[in-house]
């Protein structure tokens, strides 16, 4: 039970810190834009590896390039996280593209289109 609580807190903290780094412009790469968002973070059972699922709230934004840039900058990101958290070892980050946000925007547009046709 304690490990599950610790895992959940770490996942939340990592997501928040990565989001803060992106929004504040702490990562100096033009491929990383402020429309990126951390969808979720999943740790392995041993808390050594973490998958960070990234999405974009802007349509047409190049999520593939942004994920590549984040994977290139993961050493820097890990070093920034370790400054703010007290753990024995820094989790190894792997950034992964998550299309769920863009799919949900698409579904919302479809629903809005249906509502517009019903009103007319």
Curated annotation (Swiss-Prot):
Pfam families: RBFA (PF02033). PROSITE patterns: RBFA. It is found in: Cytoplasm. One of its GO terms (biological process) is maturation of SSU-rRNA. Disulfide bonds: none annotated. It comes from the Bacteria. One of its GO terms (molecular function) is ribosomal small subunit binding. Keywords: Cytoplasm, Ribosome biogenesis. InterPro entries: KH_dom-like_a/b, RbfA, RbfA_dom_sf, Ribosome-bd_factorA_CS. Its main location: cytoplasm. GO terms for cellular component: cytosol. Belongs to the RbfA family. One of several proteins that assist in the late maturation steps of the functional core of the 30S ribosomal subunit. Associates with free 30S ribosomal subunits (but not with 30S subunits that are part of 70S ribosomes or polysomes). Required for efficient processing of 16S rRNA. May interact with the 5'-terminal helix region of 16S rRNA. Monomer. Binds 30S ribosomal subunits, but not 50S ribosomal subunits or 70S ribosomes. This is Ribosome-binding factor A. It comes from Borreliella burgdorferi (strain ATCC 35210 / DSM 4680 / CIP 102532 / B31) (Borrelia burgdorferi). The lineage of its organism: Bacteria, Pseudomonadati, Spirochaetota, Spirochaetia, Spirochaetales.
């Amino acid at each position: 039970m304690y490990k599950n609580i610790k895992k959940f807190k770490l996942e939340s903290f990592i997501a928040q810190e990565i989001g803060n780094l992106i929004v504040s412009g702490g990562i100096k790469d033009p491929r990383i834009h402020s429309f990126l968002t951390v969808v979720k973070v999943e740790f392995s059972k041993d808390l050594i590896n973490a998958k960070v699922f990234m999405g974009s709230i802007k349509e047409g934004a190049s999520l593939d390039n942004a994920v590549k840039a984040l994977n290139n900058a993961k050493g820097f990101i890990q070093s920034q996280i370790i400054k703010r958290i007290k753990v024995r070892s820094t989790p190894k980050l792997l950034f992964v593209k998550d299309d769920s946000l863009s799919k949900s925007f698409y579904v919302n547009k479809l629903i809005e289109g249906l509502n517009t046709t019903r009103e007319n």
